[in-house]
């Protein structure tokens, strides 16, 4: 049972899982790899992580247990199960402004891909192999982390925090240039939002603001695109920012609104499928009735035909 991993570029890693169909319910791990100066590894559950009919896939900070207290990594993540059929799309999951830290050293999807797609002629399973490609853009690393001789970072209280991309100060919050407009709008519309937020540590302040931004970006997605996992994470994010001291009653209302829309979307989708099935059956009945009608017309025409002399002599 081989599992081969190899770097594709500065921020990409490829993992080939061999003999996929023979793997059991236990988690399997890729080799460790380095992106953005941080060590990572992939974790796959071929039979699903407490969920049936799916393969689950996660990315994890490999040496998280050995990192110093308070570390965090801001990333953009794309995970892909490669489809080798050129005419069919690969299965992709994407998340921006994603934070890894002590509480969340790993992140991924329980429902990465259905088992039904990993069989037959879908193109994802070829010669018993499944290929995973992960792309990680590392924007900021907070924590006292030092490079080893091999270029890999390790914890060391001497070194300073790495800033991969410059940030801007908005009312005491360090944010990326791409986040300035959104954060400014939030603080302008809700000036009391941070009155109860007492954290002085700038890294903690920034981490909390990024959780808030991620939550808003999640709720801006179409309900159709939001999975049950996304909604659970939204609940957790809301509790996190509330516990931190943010006044976000307005965001709580928006979350409930999105949940209601999600229920309507799911219920409506199910009802549409039911109606389509009923309509299909109705159309078939109409076709059957039309065929029966033509037969009856033919019988009537035959019955109306007059007898000729040939019928007698």
From Swiss-Prot:
Coiled-coil regions, chain positions: 246-297
Protein name: MATH domain and coiled-coil domain-containing protein At3g58220
Disulfide bonds: none
InterPro entries attached to this UniProt entry: MATH-CC_domain_protein (IPR050804), MATH/TRAF_dom (IPR002083), TRAF-like (IPR008974)
Top-level taxon of origin: Eukaryota
Start and end residues of each MATH domain: 10-136
Pfam families: MATH_2
Keywords assigned: Coiled coil
Native organism: Arabidopsis thaliana
Keyword Coiled coil attached: yes
SMART domains, sorted: MATH
CDD domains per UniProt: MATH (cd00121)
């Amino acid at each position: 049972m081989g599992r081969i991993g190899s770097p594709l570029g500065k921020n990409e890693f490829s993992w080939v899982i061999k003999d996929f169909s023979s793997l059991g319910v236990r988690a399997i791990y890729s080799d460790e790899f380095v992106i953005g100066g941080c060590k990572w590894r992939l974790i796959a559950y071929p039979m699903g992580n407490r969920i049936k009919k799916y393969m689950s896939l996660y990315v994890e900070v490999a040496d998280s247990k050995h990192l110093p207290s308070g570390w965090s990594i801001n990333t953009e993540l794309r995970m892909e199960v490669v489809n080798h059929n050129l005419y069919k799309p690969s299965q992709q999951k994407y998340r921006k402004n994603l934070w890894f830290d002590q509480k969340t050293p790993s992140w991924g999807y329980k429902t990465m891909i259905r088992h039904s797609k990993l069989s037959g002629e879908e193109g994802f399973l070829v010669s018993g192999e499944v290929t995973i490609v992960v792309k990680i853009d590392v924007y900021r690393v907070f924590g006292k982390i030092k490079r080893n001789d091999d270029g890999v970072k390790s914890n060391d209280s001497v070194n300073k925090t790495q800033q991969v991309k410059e940030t801007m100060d908005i009312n005491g919050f360090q944010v990326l240039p791409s986040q300035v407009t959104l954060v400014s709008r939030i603080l302008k519309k809700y000036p009391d939002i941070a009155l109860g937020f007492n954290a002085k540590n700038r890294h903690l302040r920034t981490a909390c603001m990024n959780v808030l931004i991620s939550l808003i970006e999640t709720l801006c997605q179409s309900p159709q695109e939001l999975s049950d996992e996304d909604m659970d994470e939204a609940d957790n994010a809301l509790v996190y920012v509330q516990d931190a001291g943010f006044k976000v009653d307005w965001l709580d209302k928006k979350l409930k609104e999105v949940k209601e829309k999600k229920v309507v979307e799911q219920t409506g989708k199910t009802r549409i499928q039911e109606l389509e099935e009923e309509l299909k059956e109705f159309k078939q009945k109409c076709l059957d009735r039309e065929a029966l009608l033509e037969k009856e017309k033919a019988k009537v025409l035959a019955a109306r035909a007059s007898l000729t002399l040939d019928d007698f002599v």
